[in-house]
Amino acid sequence: VPLIIWGCAVPAKDEEVLKKICETCEGENLIIGPVEEKNHKGIGAAAMGYGHTIISSSPIDVNLAKQVNILLENLGVSLDKVIVDPTTGGLGYGLEYSYSVMERLTQAAMTQGDDKLQNPMINNLGNEVWKCKEAKLTIENAPELGDPERRAILMEAVGAVSYMLAGSRILMMRHPESIKLAKAFISLLADGGSAMDVAPITKRLDDVEIDFASMAPAADLTIVEEKKKAVKVASLKEED
C-alpha cells in the first residue's frame, strides 16, 4: 500500500521536514508532497536521491502545473515519479474551478499530446471539505442546511465523485461513510445497477428533526396582470 506523506503547505517548513523524511525512509518509495515551485529543488533532489515519488502542486492553473513539472524534470526527476496536485476546492465555486482546470490538464495531455502533463492527478479532498465552515455548522446555527452529520459526509462524497469524473486517480478522504459512498459509485460505474440500492449513511450522532416548512417564506399567490406595453407608431412624413 503506498504511503503518502503530506506536509503543511508552508514551503520552508515542508522542505525542512520532507527532506529529512526522504532520507530516513530511503528506498521505501513514499509519495511526498506537496512540492511547490518555492521548494522544488530541496524536496525534489531529496526524493530523487532516496527513491521516492513526488506530488507537484500548483494553485489551480494549467500553466503553473506544467511549470512545476518542467522545473522538476530540469532538476533530473523522472516524470514517471511525479503525481500532479492541481489544488482542490471544496463544494461550490472552488470545486467548479478545480474541475475545469483538471479537464483542461487532461485535454492538454491527451488531445494535444503534452508530455509534461501526462501524469496521474491527486486530490486532497478531505482537507478542503472538513475545514470549511459549512461542514461544521451546527443545527442551531444553520438549520436550513439540514442534518450536520449527513451534510458534511455528502459534501465529501459529492466532491469525490466530481473529481473522479474530472480524471482524478487518487483521492485523499477522511470520513468512512464518504469513502463508502465513493466506492459504491465506482462499483455502479463498473458493474451497473441502481443507486437506490446503495446503503444509506450510517449515522453515529443523534438524529435531528428540522421543520423546513416553518422556515419557508409565506407563499404569495397574488396574480398580477401584466401591463401591455404601449405600441409606438412612427409618424410618416411625406416628402414634397
Predicted regions and their residues:
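Alpha-helix-loop-beta-strand connector modules within alpha/beta enzyme cores
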Residues: 1-4, 22-27, 104-123, 190-205
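Active-site beta->alpha loop and helix N-cap motifs at the rims of alpha/beta catalytic domains
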Residues: 1-63
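Acidic-enriched, low-complexity/disordered segments with a strong bias for Aspartate over Glutamate
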Residues: 14, 61, 80, 85, ...
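Short N-terminal secondary-structure initiator segments
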Residues: 22, 29, 71-74, 207-215
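Catalytic alpha/beta core domains of metabolic enzymes, predominantly
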Residues: 38-185
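Extended, intrinsically disordered, low-complexity segments
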Residues: 179, 183-240
